[in-house]
Amino acid sequence: GYAMRGGKIFVKGNAGYRTGIHMKEYKDKKPVLVVGGNTGSFLGEYLAGGLIIVLGLEEDEFPAGNFVGTGMHGGEIYIRSNKEPKNLPKQVCVNKAEKEDISKIENILEEFSSLFGVAMEEILSKSFYRLTPNAKNPYKQLYTEN
């Protein structure tokens, strides 16, 4: 998903380091990246727009590496885990996803479910955490808007 500007990528298993780096929305195009397993460090680095979902299926540990959202100034990251993300950069806010948040990504989760034969009950069996840029984010002022 490097510098992705639109479209969807669905990964059944794991992804490596710097997954989703430099993703950015462009006009009506919103990139979507879904990882069924876990990711390495620097997930969503410099994320400027779009949606990243990490499901951590068959994972007991937190399914993302270190430095999640470093340089993030747009977009959203959803991480499925019963363990809250820790050691996030100051420009990233984390909240436990509410029903309204899940309803926004439900069609993407259903698409993943259909593609890979993973039951929605399994996907929804753990909590999701929603990561967004901090409104007081010092990075946003360094970038131009679309």
Residue map of PLM features:
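Long, distal/terminal scaffolding or interaction modules
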Residues: 1-146
